[in-house]
Amino acid sequence: MALVGGSIALSFALSLVIAAPIYRVIGLSGIFAILASLGVGAMLVTYYVLPSSKPTAQIEQASLRTVFLRPELMRLNAGVFVLHATQVAMFLVVPRLLVQAGLPLVSHWQVYLPVVLLSFFLMAPFIIFGEKKQQLRKVMLLAIVLLFIAECAFIGADSVMSIATALLIYFVGFNLLEALQPSLVSRFAKESKGTALGVYNTTQSIGLFTGAVAGGWLMDSQGDLSVFAMGAALLLCWLIIAWSMRELPARAVDISTTSS
């Protein structure tokens, strides 16, 4: 699950880099056509390529209510809601900040690409530390703090360099959480992983929708910087909620185990 979460973070980061050049060539309608084609391709791969595995033993699944109300899973579900709500809201404003700082839209990839690549290198030591020292909880809390710092930094960012620095801090925390949280859901859910991950992914989608709506409304009514203030407040609430989470063994994000 750590690999799944990491791939989601990577795909989002890649979209930031390639969206503007693609838009210049084929326009917005072309981007939607590519997305539709990728969706069809994903369905074909799922149907024809992925093997159908039959369970050898019938495992009794916990009820949806039981999974939803499990305290550790509730913390993670609240976390993924906040993570993606603040993410979408933030990226309604960041492109405008870069334009105001003097960087045209078609050149934004020059900021996103190095920031994204460097963030993946910087997150690696934290993952290794969490695995070896069995300190995943501390790594997760640190990642939330990094997001909070980034949101606060955006409020005062008025140059391309300061915006890029805030983005780097943000992506280190974001990539850590995208890798950690799905694997933690799998560990806490135990025999009800399917149900728990279904609730988790649904909460993530609701967060994306809520962030877009709330972020757009705040931009129109209160100004761009209010979006970052809202994000910082939500992340502070998440930090308080996550603080009481119990520790897990480092193998929760054991990439070698996951890939095998």
Task: Tell what function each PLM region has.
Residues R24-A36, W217-L235:
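A membrane-interface helix-boundary motif in multi-pass transporters
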Residues R137-Q181:
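C-terminal transmembrane helical hairpin of 12-TM major facilitator-type secondary transporters
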Residues S192-S221:
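A late C-terminal transmembrane helix in Major Facilitator Superfamily
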Residues L92-S107:
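Short amphipathic helix-loop junctions that connect adjacent transmembrane helices
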Residues L122-Q135, M219:
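Helix-to-loop junctions at the C-terminal end of transmembrane segments
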Residues A36-P55, I241-R246:
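C-terminal membrane-cytosol helix-exit motif in multi-pass small-molecule transporters
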Residues L50-G79:
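Juxtamembrane intracellular "pre-TM" segments in multi-pass secondary transporters
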Residues V4-Y47:
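Helix-loop-helix hairpin linking two adjacent transmembrane segments in secondary transporters
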